[in-house]
């Protein structure tokens, strides 16, 4: 009975756990082994019971005890069978619970992008393409906008005649001090008066000297006139630099030239006739002095033919060469 009570306690305490089920199965196997062992003992005890009946009544006590033991043992066997029958329905729902575990619910799927974003599926590449298209459109619009007013301005512009840049008005600068034209020292008037009184002879030295002096005087007069005109015009207006005024150098005192003693003029007959100069300068207006022939040189002179440089002795003796030539052919 103690064994049965322990089995009951173990079964009651182990319900609903895997370890209790394993222990219960082990106990059930041991109980089945024991139950199978009891009929073997009963069969083995029946043979001596027949022999004991034949021997005598003294021996009848043993078989009774033997019959009681299987009867006593039989009762726990029926109890074990009852336990098995009662335990089996309890263990089955525990196994079913372990097998039929509720599956884990999958996480809810993320919401679609089309529901949240109004523009739908967009990526970085699409954004870059859109930005580049917008930039191209803006640059093209700007170019068209700049080209239209440029063409209108070119059509409206009229070619103006070229005007030379007028000189800007300059400040009136103080006129520079006018330098007096330095005239060459005039010769003493006495010899000039004498030259005017004397008649000019074309073949004389005085005429040649006068002809040489005339162009010099004419050039001197022309230079004076040019200087006077420049002085009247005044110096050109130039931007004057502010600074110290120029220091005027003291002029050197003009020293009168010493009069050279003039050679005594010889009478015309005593002089050797000298040919007048073939050409002379004539002073004309504008300073142009072409060559002019003298009145005497109206007819062109004939140049002397070339004369061989022969000695006069050879000319006087024309037969001298002939004699020499004749002498060459001697034997």
From Swiss-Prot:
Keywords: Endoplasmic reticulum, Membrane, Sarcoplasmic reticulum
Amino acid composition bias (Basic and acidic residues), ranges on this chain: 21-35, 61-71, 222-242, 250-302
Mediates interaction with CACNA1S as annotated region, ranges: 3-76
Protein name: Junctional sarcoplasmic reticulum protein 1
Record field: compositional bias (Pro residues): 103-112, 161-175
Annotated localization: Sarcoplasmic reticulum membrane; Endoplasmic reticulum membrane
GO biological process: skeletal muscle contraction
Record carries keyword Disulfide bond: no
Chain intervals for the UniProt region annotation (Disordered): 1-118, 157-331
Gene that specifies this protein: JSRP1
Pfam families (UniProt xref): JSRP
Top-level taxon in the UniProt lineage: Eukaryota
Keyword Kinase: no
Basic residues bias (residue ranges): 320-331
Function: Involved in skeletal muscle excitation/contraction coupling (EC), probably acting as a regulator of the voltage-sensitive calcium channel CACNA1S. EC is a physiological process whereby an electrical signal (depolarization of the plasma membrane) is converted into a chemical signal, a calcium gradient, by the opening of ryanodine receptor calcium release channels. May regulate CACNA1S membrane targeting and activity.
One cellular component (GO) term of this entry: sarcoplasmic reticulum
